């Protein structure tokens, strides 16, 4: 029993609030109030809700979530909060984002090679360029963003 190493089980805390500014403020207050690790600050689907995910020992996570929930409640932005004291084996691994690999941008010579490989038939010719987004007529002198009255087809709409 002396050979077994004693590990402190990490707990998971979730705080859902309304709005990015409130989420950042809550994460700041929670990090200052207890010894926790901020896992993620995620946008949820709809309503502008944000989820703050933290880990740490059980007491620290409970204290941080309580502090963050109280602060969010003062600003009328608390949606939900939850502390999972001993999450399952795969939960924390699934929650931890993997480091993203940033690919280097292609150099100008590589871009030129790709452009030269494209068939010339697909590129629109100078005379086929459409400047009017209303009538899509290449002969129309109107440019996108100019008044509709400049379109050569402006008086012909809705006629059968």
From Swiss-Prot:
Keyword Iron among UniProt keywords: yes
Applied uses, from the record: Artificial BMCs can be made in E.coli by expressing pduA-pduB/B'-pduT-pduU-pduN-pduJ-pduK (in this order). Enzymes can be targeted to the BMC, and appear to be encapsulated within it.
Superkingdom in the source lineage: Bacteria
Cofactor note: The C-terminal 70 residues (positions 90-160) when overexpressed in E.coli bind Fe. Might bind an [Fe-S] cluster in vivo.
Record key words, sorted: Bacterial microcompartment, Iron
Null mutant phenotype: Releases increased amounts of acetaldehyde when grown on propanediol. Half the cells seem to form BMC aggregates with visible shells, the other half have no BMCs. Grows normally on 1,2-PD and vitamin B12. A double pduJ-pduK strain grows in an interrupted manner on 1,2-PD and vitamin B12; grows for a while then stops, then restarts as toxic propionaldehyde accumulates and then decreases.
InterPro entries tied to this protein: BMC_dom, BMC_shell, CcmK-like_sf, CcmK/CsoS1_BMC
Pfam families according to UniProt: BMC
SMART domains: BMC (SM00877)
BMC domain location: 11-96
Cofactor list: Fe cation
Annotated CDD domains: BMC_PduK
Protein's pathway: Polyol metabolism; 1,2-propanediol degradation
Location relative to the cell: Bacterial microcompartment
Induction conditions: BMC production is induced by growth on 1,2-PD vitamin B12 medium.
GO CC field: propanediol degradation polyhedral organelle
GO terms of biological process kind: propanediol catabolic process
Function according to Swiss-Prot or TrEMBL: A minor shell protein of the bacterial microcompartment (BMC) dedicated to 1,2-propanediol (1,2-PD) degradation. The isolated BMC shell component protein ratio for J:A:B':B:K:T:U is approximately 15:10:7:6:1:1:2. Not required for structural integrity of BMCs nor to mitigate propionaldehyde toxicity, it might be involved in spatial organization of BMCs.
Similarity field: Belongs to the bacterial microcompartments protein family.
Subunit structure and binding partners: Interacts with shell proteins PduA and PduP and assembly protein PduM.
Protein name: Bacterial microcompartment shell protein PduK
């Amino acid at each position: 029993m002396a050979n077994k190493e004693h590990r402190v089980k990490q707990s998971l805390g979730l705080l859902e609030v309304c709005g990015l500014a409130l989420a950042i403020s809550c994460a700041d207050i929670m990090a200052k109030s207890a010894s926790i690790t901020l896992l993620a600050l995620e946008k949820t689907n709809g309503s502008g809700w944000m989820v703050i995910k933290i880990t740490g020992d059980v007491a620290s996570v409970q204290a941080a979530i309580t502090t963050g929930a109280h602060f969010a409640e003062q600003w009328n932005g608390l949606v939900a909060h939850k502390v999972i004291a001993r999450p399952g084996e795969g939960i924390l691994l699934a929650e931890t984002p993997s480091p993203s690999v940033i690919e280097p941008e292609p150099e100008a010579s590589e871009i030129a090679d790709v452009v030269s490989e494209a068939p010339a038939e697909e590129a629109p010719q100078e005379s086929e360029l459409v400047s009017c987004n209303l009538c899509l007529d290449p002969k129309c002198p109107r440019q996108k963003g100019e008044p509709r009255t400049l379109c050569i087809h402006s008086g012909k709409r809705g006629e059968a």
